[in-house]
Design a protein with these regions (language model features):
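Soluble acyl-CoA-dependent acyltransferase catalytic core bearing the H(X)4D motif
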Residues: 2-14, 25, 34-404
Length: 404
C-alpha cells in the first residue's frame, strides 16, 4: 500500500519535458552548456560539494533524472549523490602548457555523452594553475535543464557578497540618460505632443508599420535560409558532417574597461561594441585570406569586391523573459517560478548579418553594428521563431523540429 502511495506521489512530481527541452534531445542536436570559471585560489572539493548540497541540489532540474514513460520524456525526482557529479581528476602540477591542457580537457569533455541514469549535469574541478587562474571549475549541463539566463540567475542566486554573507550580489543597472537630459527631453516631448497630437499619432502608426515590416522581412529571410538561402562559402562555413567532428574551444581575453570606454564615448551598448569588434575581425581575416596571393596593385580591387560579395550571418539566441535580474534562491526553487519567471528554455532565434567590409575608420564597424542591432530590436523575429519551433515540435515531434 505504501509503495503504491509513493509511486502515486512520484508521478505527481514528474514533469513532461517542454517542446524547447525536447528539441535539445533530438538526434544530431544533443546540446550541452559548457561554462568555465576561474578561481584566484585553489579549489577545495569538500567545500564545493557541501555548498552544492545546500543550493544547486535543491533545484528540481538538478535533482531529477530523465526517464521515458509511455513514449514521453519526463523529469523524475531522484536522490542525488553529489560525489557522482563532482569530478576531480588527479593532475600533475608540472604540466608544461597548462592553458593547452585545459583547452584539450574541455574539448575532450564535449565528446563524452552524459549518463542519463542520473541528473544531467557535472562539475569538473581542475586545481591547475594557468595564465588566468589558480584553479578552474568546468560545468557541463544539458541544455534541456535550462538556458543561459536561467542558469546564470541560479548561479548568482547561489552566491553571496564577501562583504555581507547574507546578501545577494548586486548587478549594476543599465545606465539611462542623465536626469537633466531626461527631464528636458520629456518636457520637449510633452510640449510637442500637446501642440501636435496628430503628428504623434502618425509617428506611432509609422513605428507599428515598421515593426510589422521588419518582422515580415526577417521571417521571410529566416524561412528562405532554411530552404535555400545559404551563406557564402568561406573558411568559417563548415562542410557537411562538421557537427560530428570534435570541437575545440579557443578564446582570447579582452579588457572590459576598453569596451566600456568605447561604449560610453559613442553612447552605445556593450553588445554594439562587441558586434562591431567581431565584424572588424572577420572582415580583416577574410580580406587577408582572399587577398593573400594578390599583388599590391591588385589588392585594392580585391578589397572592394570583398565588400559586396560576402554573405555571412550568425544565429543569436534571445532571452524572451519579461523579467530580468537576480531571483532569490527560494523563488527559483518554488513551483510557481516556472510560470512567474519562466525557468527552462525561453529563447528565440534571430539571424544577425555581418557587414563584411574594410572600413577606413575603425569606429564605422561599431556604427554599422549598432544600426544592425537597432533594426533587430524593432522586430518580433525572436518571438515568432520561438512559437514556430514550438508549434512544429508539438505537431510533428522533436525529431522533425530538428530537420536540417
Amino acid at each position: 500500500m505504501e509503495s503504491r502511495e509513493a509511486e502515486a506521489s512520484r508521478s505527481k512530481e514528474e514533469e513532461t519535458l517542454s517542446p524547447a527541452a525536447l528539441l535539445f534531445h533530438a538526434p544530431h542536436f544533443n546540446c550541452h552548456i559548457i561554462a568555465v570559471m576561474g578561481c584566484k585560489i585553489p579549489i577545495d572539493p569538500t567545500i564545493v560539494k557541501l555548498g552544492l548540497e545546500h543550493t544547486l541540489i535543491k533545484h528540481p532540474r538538478f535533482s531529477s533524472k530523465l526517464v521515458i514513460k509511455s513514449r514521453k520524456m519526463k523529469w523524475t525526482p531522484t536522490t542525488v549523490n553529489v560525489q557522482d557529479h563532482v569530478i576531480v581528476p588527479n593532475l600533475d602540477n608540472k604540466i608544461e602548457s597548462p592553458n593547452q591542457f585545459i583547452e584539450d580537457y574541455i574539448s575532450h569533455l564535449t565528446t563524452i555523452p552524459m549518463d542519463s541514469s542520473k541528473p544531467l549535469w557535472e562539475l569538473h574541478l581542475l586545481n591547475l594553475k594557468s595564465s588566468y587562474a589558480e584553479a578552474i571549475g568546468i560545468f557541463k549541463i544539458h541544455h534541456s535543464i535550462g538556458d543561459g539566463a536561467s542558469l546564470m540567475s541560479l548561479l548568482l542566486a547561489c552566491t553571496r557578497k564577501t562583504s555581507d554573507p547574507e546578501a545577494l550580489p548586486t548587478i549594476p543597472m543599465q545606465k539611462r540618460a542623465s536626469a537633466s537630459n531626461s527631464s528636458t527631453a520629456s518636457a520637449s516631448a510633452s510640449a510637442s505632443a500637446s501642440s501636435n497630437g496628430l503628428q504623434k499619432l502618425f509617428w506611432n502608426i509609422f513605428m507599428i508599420l515598421k515593426l510589422v515590416w521588419n518582422t515580415l522581412v526577417d521571417l521571410i529571410l529566416f524561412v528562405s535560409t532554411i530552404l535555400f538561402l545559404k551563406d557564402t562559402k568561406t573558411p568559417f562555413k563548415g562542410e557537411s558532417g562538421v557537427d560530428l567532428k570534435p570541437k575545440r574551444f579557443v578564446y582570447r581575453s579582452v579588457s572590459l574597461d576598453d569596451i566600456k570606454l568605447v561604449k560610453n564615448k559613442m553612447n552605445m551598448t556593450i553588445n554594439d561594441v562587441i558586434l562591431g569588434i567581431t565584424q572588424a575581425g572577420l572582415s580583416r581575416y577574410l580580406n587577408h585570406q582572399f587577398g593573400k596571393n594578390e599583388k599590391d596593385g591588385d589588392r585594392k580591387h580585391k578589397k572592394i569586391s570583398l565588400q559586396k560579395s560576402i554573405r555571412l550571418r550568425a544565429t543569436v539566441l534571445v532571452n524572451l523573459r519579461p523579467v530580468v535580474g537576480i531571483q532569490t534562491l527560494a523563488e527559483l526553487m518554488g513551483k510557481e517560478s516556472k510560470g512567474k519567471w519562466g525557468w527552462g528554455n525561453s529563447i528565440g532565434y534571430i539571424m544577425v548579418p555581418f557587414t563584411i567590409a574594410l572600413q577606413d575608420d575603425p569606429l564605422d564597424y561599431i556604427r554599422k553594428a549598432k544600426a544592425t542591432i537597432d533594426r533587430k530590436k524593432l522586430s518580433l523575429e525572436a518571438i515568432f521563431t520561438f512559437q514556430i519551433a514550438k508549434l512544429v515540435i508539438m505537431t510533428f515531434g522533436h525529431k522533425m523540429g530538428n530537420c536540417r
